[in-house]
Amino acid sequence: YMPKHQRRIIQKIPDFDILSEHPQDLCEDVVREITEHKYTGVKYTKHAGVGEVISEHYDIRVGDEVIAFLYKPLACHSYNTIRINGDSHANGETIRIATIDTMLSFYLAFIYADRIYYDINRILCMSQFLFDVQQHNRLKQTGLLRRFSINCYGKQATLESMRFEKTAKYEELKGKRGTREFEEWFLRYVPYENAGARARALVARRL
């Protein structure tokens, strides 16, 4: 769905965003496989999640270049399937590709995560391209463009499990009030309360 001149540019960017229930195990497998092909300086790094928006995740690097990010799913994310390297089940291989809605939800979360390893301009460009593809193919519900798929990867959190996780996280962070991690999990912002506080402060100054 991408014009040839744009496709040539993207092919030079060997970046992957991958969902895995066991991202650390997958990182170890990938690093071992790449190292066996005589590449050096291959390693992976773990990064903390961002509240309830982005889970704990890992990057895989060859030297200074990041080639993949791996995320543990926070919900059940929809995907479509395609076959490559053959048309039949005997000689082909099925791969899962996230739906455009799933990709956009992650990309927009990356923008607001404020992490130095995310290239905001690249993310915005890819988000715009995906949005345009979706707009131009609104009525096409086949292949990778199928928007609503019954297939999903990961486990959808229930209200009970979310409460349990938040309680456990509060016990872990209650001694770190004022830190960024605490605010990402428990920041409470109520606009009308803040407006009322500013109004009271203004009246007090005038008096």
What is each PLM-predicted segment?
Residues I67-R206:
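Active-site and adjacent loop segments of nucleotide-processing enzymes
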Residues Q24-V31:
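Short, conserved charged micro-motifs
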Residues E33-S78:
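Conserved catalytic core of two-metal-ion nucleotidyltransferases
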Residues Y1-Q24:
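Active-site nucleotide-donor binding segment shared across nucleotidyl transfer reactions
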Residues Y1-Q6, V31-R32, H136, A201:
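Proteins with a high burden of low-complexity, intrinsically disordered sequence enriched in S/T/G/P/A and R
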Residues R7-R8, H37-G41, D87-N91:
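Short, low-complexity, polar/charged sequence segments that are solvent-exposed and flexible
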